[in-house]
């Protein structure tokens, strides 16, 4: 059975939660062994897949979880706004570390390596390709190039201002167009994740609301300060 078919079965049985275990950079939690522990806890709680950034974190996580891992490498480039898995060597390193799915930036922006080249390299390793997109045009273009999974990950992050709510409209438009959609980006409550599934998402990735303790504490602190001021 193919990995996509296996995921279809798991999603039907468990609801389609993917947990992104990406601690705040330089956080006390930003250690491979802690990332792996969070991923294992998420798997034991019913996550159908895990999203991991960085080769060392992926290697540590692969050693302890059996669910599929979506691997990415983030870089800050001087000559491109693209941050997610921008280079061939990133794809190769993630494949060697044990990723099942490799996600790349799928937006229409200047980049060091074309999307189609990265997708071909992912498929060369026999892995599934996911593209992190920001618009319907991004997603449909990536689907035509052969990406098996389209993520709404970058919606709201390629524009001057980022909305507070997730982009359910993008989820629906891509789903209606026949894409296998992972809803991602600002899904901070179970209700929002459920809404994404109702709008046609194949699965939903949740990160900050589960694995970024600093963000969660900030949300509580902000709300509580407003209540007493």
Swiss-Prot record:
Molecular function GO terms recorded: N-acylglucosamine-6-phosphate 2-epimerase activity
GO annotation, biological process: carbohydrate metabolic process; N-acetylmannosamine catabolic process; N-acetylneuraminate catabolic process
EC number(s) recorded for this UniProt protein: 5.1.3.9
Catalysed reaction, written as an equation: an N-acyl-D-glucosamine 6-phosphate = an N-acyl-D-mannosamine 6-phosphate
Gene3D superfamilies: Aldolase class I (3.20.20.70)
Top enzyme class: isomerase
Keyword Transmembrane: no
Superkingdom of the organism of origin: Bacteria
Similarity-based family: Belongs to the NanE family.
PANTHER family: N-ACETYLMANNOSAMINE-6-PHOSPHATE 2-EPIMERASE-RELATED (PTHR36204:SF1)
Task performed by this protein: Converts N-acetylmannosamine-6-phosphate (ManNAc-6-P) to N-acetylglucosamine-6-phosphate (GlcNAc-6-P).
Protein name: Putative N-acetylmannosamine-6-phosphate 2-epimerase
Gene for this chain: nanE
């Amino acid at each position: 059975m193919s990995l996509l078919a296996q995921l279809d079965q798991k999603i039907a049985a468990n609801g389609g939660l993917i947990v992104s275990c990406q601690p705040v950079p330089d956080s006390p939690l930003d250690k491979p062994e802690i990332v792996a522990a969070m991923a294992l806890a998420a798997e034991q709680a019913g996550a159908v897949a895990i999203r991991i950034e960085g080769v060392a974190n992926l290697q540590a996580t692969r050693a302890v979880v059996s669910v599929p891992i979506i691997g990415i490498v983030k870089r800050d480039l001087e000559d491109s706004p693209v941050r997610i898995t921008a280079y061939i060597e990133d794809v190769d390193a993630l494949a060697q570390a044990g990723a099942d799915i490799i996600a790349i930036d799928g937006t229409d922006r200047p980049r060091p390596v074309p999307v189609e080249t990265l997708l071909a390299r992912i498929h060369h390793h026999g892995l599934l390709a996911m593209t992190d997109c920001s618009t319907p045009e991004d997603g449909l273009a990536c689907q035509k190039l052969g990406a098996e999974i389209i993520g709404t990950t970058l919606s709201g992050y390629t524009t001057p201002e980022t909305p507070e709510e997730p982009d359910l409209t993008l989820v629906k438009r891509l789903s209606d167009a026949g894409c296998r959609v992972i809803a991602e980006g600002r899904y901070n409550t179970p209700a929002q994740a459920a809404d994404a599934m109702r709008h046609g998402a194949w699965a939903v990735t949740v990160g900050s609301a589960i694995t970024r303790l600093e963000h969660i504490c900030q949300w509580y602190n902000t709300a509580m300060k407003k209540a007493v001021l």
